[in-house]
Amino acid sequence: KSLRSVSILKLRKILERIDTVEVLFNANRYILQLSEDVYCDYLACLDWLKDKRVRTQPDFEYFYDIISKGEVFKGESFDWMDDFKSYICNSTVDVLSRFIDTYSIEDEADRVIQIADQILLNDPCNEEALLYKIKALIYQNNFKLARYVYDRFCALYQEMYGEAFPSSFEQVVPSPLMSQQSPQ
């Protein structure tokens, strides 16, 4: 407890120099109070998720720019954070899943892969994201990488669920895409 107090005291001294940020103690909780002049991308993202404000393509691009900077509280695992992290991850996956199909694999394969990767970061066994990523990789003629992504996904699926992923690579990949594969 004293280590926490020392850390907060140091934090307060640093933040004293910034007029727009304050550390408050209220009802046995520390609160970081930001003035309206302060922009915090994390809080902006949280507001967008709570209000379900990601409705248009420009909204999505702004939202994606924020979340693509990294996983929320990466590496932190405290019981009191679990519900919060789960809310952020699930809400983020919902938004990403809603918008991924607005991008054409033929015209924007790289963007589809980026969005699929972001979904898989938040939900490592998301089958929809796997399908989008594999389709985009095959469209780019990255057959070996598509197979590698599939194999990694299957290993993780086996580890998480204790059973094999139910679909083979050939079942996952639409036949017209497989016929594009050049002989090796």
Predicted regions and their residues:
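Intrinsically disordered, low-complexity protein-interaction/activation regions
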Residues: 1-121, 127-128, 145-152, 158-160, ...
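Terminal recognition/anchoring or ligand-binding modules at protein termini
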Residues: 123, 140
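Glycine-centered helix-boundary capping/hinge motifs
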Residues: 141, 161-162
